[in-house]
Amino acid sequence: MAAAWGLKTLVIDLDPQASATVSIGVDISNCKTTIYDVIVDGATIQDSLVSTSVKGLDLVPASLELAKAELRLSQLDEPDTAMRKACEAIRESYDAIFFDCPPSLGVLTSNALVAAESVVIPVQCEYLALEGLSALVQAIDVVRHGRNPDLEIAGIVLTMTDFRSNLAREVAEEVKRFFPGKVFETAIPRNIRVAESPSFGKPVCVYEPHSTGAMAYQLLAEEVAKRLLDKGGLEAVRVPSGAVEGPTP
């Protein structure tokens, strides 16, 4: 969405499952250099950049080798600073840089937290997700009191929601009660277009821009941009509010 607004955008995929890489339509087998080579072997981000089919969007792809990165990084004196050091050379080249993290609190996620300015936390509307949320918030506090005192939680987004379910409503209320003012108004619903867009190698906002899921991501992006603007974390964003109309399933 940031790229659609004319922002030069970079996605860095830190998930060994490479979900972001695949979803954007990049074939990992064609990538000679990945984020593993950057944070473990000292390659530069410039060496691993991949242009995507989305105008203004670049990617640093993940690879299955990332599963070994935790062990390699843990042997370093400062295992959680590799990503921040690698980003120093390219920060001024992009308007927005996003880290896609694995669903665990290991060294890869720590590297992203040390390098980032803000965190957007996705939470599925399931009870087990609440424990993971609490652990992540505690990890963010540790990083904030250590290597990255400027790190902030931009907000929490409820995902895969179906508010016809009592469970989904109860979990949403619980998250809002424990984290007042942090939960975005926009929730991402369960939507077939969101689920199938990765198989076509396109973000849902490109694959089916008028779908309910794409509309939700558009509204969420506007909320995130507004919060970052209010905090001074984004110098200028021209958000075409309401540019997409007429949602379809």
Predicted feature residues:
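P-loop NTP-binding core
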Residues: 1-249
